[in-house]
């Protein structure tokens, strides 16, 4: 949730999102931790501009590792897809990591509204991918949070059909972890035996 603008001086709720994004990148570099993959869980742009996605790509280029992404409610997928692909960032939604794990990225965007929902296509795709790799553990990524965040304003914009997702995942106990964005705060919950994590935004 970087919420970048085409113009680097623009602010969101008083925060310059380009500067805060750069500060987070600098902090990561300063820690000097190994990094194998960057996963961007949506709301990369606030203004849906191609330039905002280019700014995101420029920021992560210094890590020299692959990046995968999924859309959030603020993103405009045509600009997101073309701009990130031009920057060499893969649109892949299934990533194998070694022999034991896979990462699957779901699109929960309902364009034009803040809440999320997984389409029948997404749920069918997920079930097909999980069934094809029964021996792999799975990390599942999506933008919208499937469990309440404890904030009534945020929770009205959550994943609307989390029960349908839970029904699919119940068949596949090797789905160990889920990671979402959207709520701009840390979350670490148990969801029917799966670990559900959310991370703060780089801005507000």
For the regions a protein language model found, what residue spans apply to each?
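Active-site glycine-centered loops adjacent to acidic/histidine catalytic or metal-binding residues
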Residues: 1, 42-43, 72, 143, ...
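Metal-dependent catalytic neighborhoods of phosphoester/phosphodiester hydrolases
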Residues: 40-61, 76-89, 151-153, 187-192
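Alpha-helical scaffolding within the catalytic cores
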Residues: 23-24, 54, 79-94, 124-127, ...
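Active-site-proximal beta-strand elements of phosphoester/diester hydrolases
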Residues: 1-6, 100-110, 139-142, 194-200
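Acidic/histidine-rich helix-loop elements
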Residues: 3-20, 46, 76-89, 111-120
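A short, structured active-site edge motif that brings together acidic residues
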Residues: 67-77
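His/acidic metal-ligating clusters that form di-metal
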Residues: 24-37, 115-195
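N-terminal active-site segment of His-dependent metallophosphoesterases
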Residues: 1-55, 59, 149
């Amino acid at each position: 949730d970087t919420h970048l603008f085409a113009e680097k001086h623009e602010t969101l709720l008083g925060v310059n999102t380009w500067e805060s994004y750069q500060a987070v990148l600098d902090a990561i570099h300063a820690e000097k931790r190994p990094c194998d993959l960057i996963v961007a869980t949506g709301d990369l742009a606030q203004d849906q501009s191609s330039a905002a996605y280019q700014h995101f790509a420029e920021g992560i280029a210094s890590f020299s590792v692959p990046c995968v992404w999924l859309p959030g409610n603020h993103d405009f997928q045509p600009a997101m897809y073309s701009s990130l692909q031009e920057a060499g960032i893969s649109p892949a939604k299934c990533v194998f990591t070694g022999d034991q794990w896979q990462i699957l990225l779901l699109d929960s965007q309902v364009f034009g509204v803040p809440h999320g929902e997984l389409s029948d296509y997404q749920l069918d795709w997920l079930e097909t991918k999980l069934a094809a790799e029964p021996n792999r553990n799975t990390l599942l990524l999506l933008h919208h949070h499937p469990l309440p965040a404890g904030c009534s304003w945020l929770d009205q914009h959550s994943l609307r059909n989390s029960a349908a997702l839970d029904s699919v995942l119940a068949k596949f106990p090797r789905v160990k972890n889920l990671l979402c964005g959207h709520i701009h705060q840390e979350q670490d919950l148990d969801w029917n035996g799966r670990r559900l994590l959310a991370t703060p935004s780089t801005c507000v």
